[in-house]
């Protein structure tokens, strides 16, 4: 037996079994551990190249059309038809820009970055995450509140592209065709319309830093994120074909809109000329100059040419969110309990109770999940270890298990 082992050699590098850590035996061949590791790296690189080529070889006829994109969004997000239409068209045109051939006519289709304005809990982030499910390009979500100017505590602007590179498995060509969603863009508005003598490191300074990304330029990106340092190897990324979608709540911007329209937001008598204005939903009248009044610099606004808004969710919309989408809250909890062999059901009056509380405390759609989580916590803790295999969650159960103080502390 020892003699046979001495005669076994790696079919790739020729090393004998006695000089390697591990020898894997096939039908008519052997491979040592070192060659197996190298082969694994080759396979990974080949698969990544294939994935990149598959993306680069997108065909016009294979592209999802705007109506198809919106239908997909409809299956996950309730309402917000206007925002869905804008987003669907922008994503479709982004694909077409990627497929654009060099023409002799010199016409180059410019990208149309988007900014979405809407109250907290109306679905801005959910729209972005949902559309990522059907994309064939890398997609990254970034929180603008963590960004600061270079040299200050926080994340550099370039860290946005680090996230995109990570989503693309560090395939630069793929990342350069990706989509970036910047959430809470309103939090980097400058603190006032007038320049301040104090440094606004997380406001106007960050906006200035974002300009080079939005307008399209080659940016040196630290591969692992964090602060740049002289010895770190940078990855150059061309942002000309990266689509940026920005979103924010812009709390208080309704007053800016009302001032421009010379009307009041709500609660007062308006002049005859303003009777046609819907003062309970002023966001539908938002214009770029309102963003400037709020604190976005004109250069940023100019590079976000598509402006759309999200409607406040009414009671019916919140009620539908509980049950209608593919990943509705109730469906998620039914699945969670089913994994423990427990059948859970929610009564209509319980769902109405949850919606009423979300409206009462102005929690929006995001608050629905928090309320249900609080109500279901005791059952999720005890039932997996118990013998009871059914649970009917009605209004009485919800009232008994909802701790409002804990809920509001979490918001």
Swiss-Prot record:
Entry similarity comment: Belongs to the ClpX chaperone family.
Record's protein name: ATP-dependent Clp protease ATP-binding subunit ClpX
Gene behind this protein: clpX
Domain of life: Bacteria
Binding site for ATP: 119-126
Residues engaged in binding Zn(2+): 10, 13, 32, 35
A molecular function (GO) term: ATP-dependent protein folding chaperone
Chain ranges of the ClpX-type ZB domain: 1-51
Assembly mode: Component of the ClpX-ClpP complex. Forms a hexameric ring that, in the presence of ATP, binds to fourteen ClpP subunits assembled into a disk-like structure with a central cavity, resembling the structure of eukaryotic proteasomes.
Pfam families reported for this sequence: AAA_2, ClpB_D2-small, zf-C4_ClpX
Keyword annotations from UniProtKB, A to Z: ATP-binding, Chaperone, Metal-binding, Nucleotide-binding, Zinc
Organism: Porphyromonas gingivalis (strain ATCC BAA-308 / W83)
Segments passing through the bilayer: none
Single GO cellular component term: HslUV protease complex
Role: ATP-dependent specificity component of the Clp protease. It directs the protease to specific substrates. Can perform chaperone functions in the absence of ClpP.
């Amino acid at each position: 037996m020892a003699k046979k082992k001495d005669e076994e050699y790696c079919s790739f590098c020729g090393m004998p079994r006695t000089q390697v850590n591990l020898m894997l035996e096939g039908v008519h061949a052997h491979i040592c551990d070192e060659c197996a590791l190298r082969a694994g790296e080759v396979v990974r690189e080949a698969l990544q190249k294939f994935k990149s080529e598959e993306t680069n070889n997108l065909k016009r006829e294979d592209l999802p059309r705007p109506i198809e994109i919106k239908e997909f969004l409809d299956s996950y997000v309730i309402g917000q038809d206007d925002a869905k239409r804008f987003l669907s068209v922008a994503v479709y045109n982004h694909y077409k820009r990627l497929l654009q051939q060099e023409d002799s006519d010199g016409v180059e289709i410019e990208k149309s970055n988007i900014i979405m304005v809407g109250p907290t809990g109306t679905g801005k982030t959910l729209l972005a995450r949902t559309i990522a499910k059907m994309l064939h390009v890398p997609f990254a979500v970034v929180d603008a509140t963590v960004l600061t100017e270079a040299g200050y505590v926080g994340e550099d602007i370039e860290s946005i592209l680090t996230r995109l590179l990570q989503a693309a498995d560090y395939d630069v060509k793929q990342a350069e065709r990706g989509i970036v969603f910047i959430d809470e863009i309103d939090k980097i508005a400058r603190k006032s319309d007038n320049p301040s003598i104090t440094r606004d490191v997380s406001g106007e300074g960050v906006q200035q830093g974002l300009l080079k990304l939005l307008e399209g330029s080659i940016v040196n990106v630290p591969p692992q994120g964090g602060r740049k340092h002289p010895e770190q190897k940078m990855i150059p990324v061309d942002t000309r074909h990266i689509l940026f979608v920005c979103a924010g709540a812009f709390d208080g911007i309704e007053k800016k809109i009302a001032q421009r329209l010379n009307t009041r937001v709500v609660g007062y008598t308006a002049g005859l000329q303003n009777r046609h204005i819907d003062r309970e939903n002023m966001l539908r009248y938002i214009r770029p100059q309102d963003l400037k009044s709020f604190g976005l610099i004109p250069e940023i606004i100019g590079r976000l040419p598509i402006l759309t808004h999200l409607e406040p969710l009414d009671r019916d919309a919140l009620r539908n969110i509980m049950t209608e989408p593919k990943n509705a809250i109730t469906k998620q909890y039914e699945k969670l309990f089913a994994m423990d062999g427990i059948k859970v059901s929610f009564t209509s009056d319980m769902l109405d109770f949850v919606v009423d509380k979300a409206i009462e405390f102005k929690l929006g759609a995001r608050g629905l999940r928090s309320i249900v989580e609080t109500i279901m916590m005791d059952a999720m803790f005890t039932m997996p270890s118990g013998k009871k295999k059914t649970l009917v969650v009605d209004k009485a159960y919800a009232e008994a298990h909802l701790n409002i103080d804990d809920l509001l502390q979490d918001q």
